[in-house]
């Protein structure tokens, strides 16, 4: 496998820390050792997160091509758009963000706090759009790029989650290589890796990266899209394309993609009672915050799997914390009593 042939522009502090979740592990019976790799602490750029790791492989193309405006898209509380806005500010570029109405959640301040508030502070041109949630290329995003061209700018397209960009999976191939280096220091290997999946490129990169040592199917995706067939198709397609880019040396198959579809409901961006319980439990056992859209759902999935005995006794499970905590502010009503 050859990831190093692809240029990378550092936006992160370096390897993200792995911490044992000792109290949570004990609370759940002590038969499975839980750890977290803190992608939520990976950068000083507006709280960072998993998209910042991905953007490291897109920025060289931005700089080499003379682009002056980053154009991205997400929901109103998108972590992706906040991270794109931060990277644009860091590089001295303009930024246009399309924020679609992906979540059926009514709150008076939903479009004024959290991620979207930070994007505005960072100087992005934030454009609200009424379109609902879907996965793939969006007309509103294409229109935003055309608007930049008409104004004389040169837009660089960054799709939702970086996932439709050809290089969108590379960052999390690097995640897997980083984990292997940390495992060598620890003196053990993780048996499973748990990660939230929606647009697909985070899990796809992990699948490719861990395929290099035979653990592709030990990457357990927890769907948070509530459109799991679309998400599964994206993961598989992106993983296959990424495997070619890094010269993995073998094909990625359907069996390599494991996606647990039990925790994404009731729909994208809306937590269920299990999500909220997982957020509170993780916070109160470990002081580690997760959000109602993504990490709360993947945390719910991991906790439920431990409780149900789905991880063999003695397993070491690595939870990939992808970030997203700023979105908690947009759901304050749900936590008004803690």
UniProtKB/Swiss-Prot annotation:
Record: active site: 78 (nucleophile)
Coiled-coil regions listed: none
Listed cofactors: pyridoxal 5'-phosphate
N6-(pyridoxal phosphate)lysine found at: 51
Sorted UniProt keywords: Hydrolase, Plasmid, Pyridoxal phosphate
A molecular function (GO) term: D-cysteine desulfhydrase activity
EC number, as in UniProt: 3.5.99.7
Catalytically driven reaction(s): 1-aminocyclopropane-1-carboxylate + H2O = 2-oxobutanoate + NH4(+)
GO BP annotations listed: 1-aminocyclopropane-1-carboxylate metabolic process; amine catabolic process
Source organism, top-level taxon: Bacteria
One Pfam family named in its UniProt record: PALP
Function recorded in the entry: Catalyzes a cyclopropane ring-opening reaction, the irreversible conversion of 1-aminocyclopropane-1-carboxylate (ACC) to ammonia and alpha-ketobutyrate. Allows growth on ACC as a nitrogen source.
The family this protein is said to belong to: Belongs to the ACC deaminase/D-cysteine desulfhydrase family.
Descriptive protein name: 1-aminocyclopropane-1-carboxylate deaminase
Gene from which this protein is expressed: acdS
């Amino acid at each position: 496998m050859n990831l190093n042939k692809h240029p990378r522009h550092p936006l992160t502090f370096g390897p993200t820390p792995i911490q044992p979740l000792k109290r949570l592990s004990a609370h759940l019976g002590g038969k499975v050792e839980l750890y977290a790799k803190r992608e939520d602490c990976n950068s000083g750029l507006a709280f960072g997160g998993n998209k910042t790791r991905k953007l490291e492989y897109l920025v060289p193309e931005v700089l080499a091509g003379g682009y002056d405006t980053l154009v991205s898209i997400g929901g109103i509380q998108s972590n992706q758009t906040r991270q794109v806005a931060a990277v644009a500010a860091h590089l001295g570029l303009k930024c246009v963000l399309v924020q679609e109405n992906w979540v059926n959640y009514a709150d008076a301040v939903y479009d004024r706090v959290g991620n979207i508030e930070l994007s505005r502070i960072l100087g992005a041109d934030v454009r609200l759009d009424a379109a609902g949630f879907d996965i793939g290329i969006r007309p509103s995003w294409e229109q935003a790029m055309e608007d930049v061209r008409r104004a004389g700018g040169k837009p660089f397209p960054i799709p939702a989650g970086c996932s439709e960009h050809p290089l969108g999976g590379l960052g999390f191939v690097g995640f897997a290589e980083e984990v292997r280096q940390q495992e060598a220091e620890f003196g053990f290997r993780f048996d499973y890796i748990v990660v939230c999946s929606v647009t697909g490129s985070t899990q796809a990169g992990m699948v490719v990266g861990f395929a290099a040592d035979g653990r592709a199917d030990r990457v357990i995706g927890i769907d948070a899209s509530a459109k799991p067939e679309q998400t599964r198709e994206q993961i598989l397609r992106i993983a296959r394309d990424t495997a070619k880019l890094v010269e993995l040396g073998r094909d990625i198959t359907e069996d390599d993609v494991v996606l647990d579809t039990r925790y994404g409901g009731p729909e994208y961006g809306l937590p269920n009672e299990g999500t909220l319980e997982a957020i509170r439990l993780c916070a109160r056992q470990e002081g580690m915050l997760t959000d109602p859209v993504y990490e709360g759902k993947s945390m719910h999935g991991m906790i439920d799997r431990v409780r149900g005995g789905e991880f063999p006794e003695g397993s070491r499970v690595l939870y990939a914390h992808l970030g997203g905590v700023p979105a908690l502010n947009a759901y304050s009503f749900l936590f008004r009593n803690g």
